[in-house]
Amino acid sequence: MNSKYEINTKENREFLKASCENLLNFGHRFPSPNGGSYYLGDDGTPWKDRNRETWITCRMAHVYSLGLMLGHEGSGELVDAALKGLRGELHDDKNGGWYAGVTQEGGIVPNKQCYAHAFVILAASSALTAGRPGAKELLEEAVDVYDQHFWNEEEGLACDTWNTEFTVLDDYRGLNANMHTVEAFLAAGDVTGDKKYHIRAGRIIDHVIRWAEDNSWRIPEHFTKEWVADLDCNRDRPDDPFKPYGATPGHGIEWARLITQWALANCREV
């Protein structure tokens, strides 16, 4: 085996460091003038004819918060640009929370997604860990909105999608948003020291492990509002980007990582 692929060899550490730097260099041109993230082409060129989405902007805030802590040049300014977008064009000043995104002309992409709001918590948590101005206030608002509209304390799970005004809740329930909620709650618990976030993450994980066990260890992705697995969801549209038909192997890998992270943080066996 090539030594650069052998864990913790000198060549492996150098390879990982170089790969990390290449990825961080690639994304430097993501911010639009108002802070929302552009999609990027293969060479890092901004695609200005596409929507600027909240979840991508949050991911960029998270990534460059890590970059800042790794000493990557320019990361602080990029985090601040993404936070500007989350406080500005992506924020719904009238109804609260965050739009799914904005169009290239600045119009609103409708609906309020748990998926996007979980990412706002992650972005703010990471930015706060990295010491960026305004991150604490953003995190406080993000968890307040999330608690009010998405988290169900009785169920120990999060709902999925509201209309833009937060007046009509869709019947669909899904694990993709809950997976990223676990990611966000782990980050929020780490930076605030509030144990309730790790407890909530553990409650979601308990559900997921049980559902996986009941389904031959293939994790169901889609559910009814009563949290009954809907194994036929999108059978006719198997390539839906956010609600694909069937189990998603990559999500199984991500759940394994999140469950391990939660267990290590809480000194638990699973």
For each feature predicted by the language model, list its residue ranges.
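Glycan-recognition and catalytic cores of secretory/periplasmic carbohydrate-active enzymes
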Residues: M1-V270
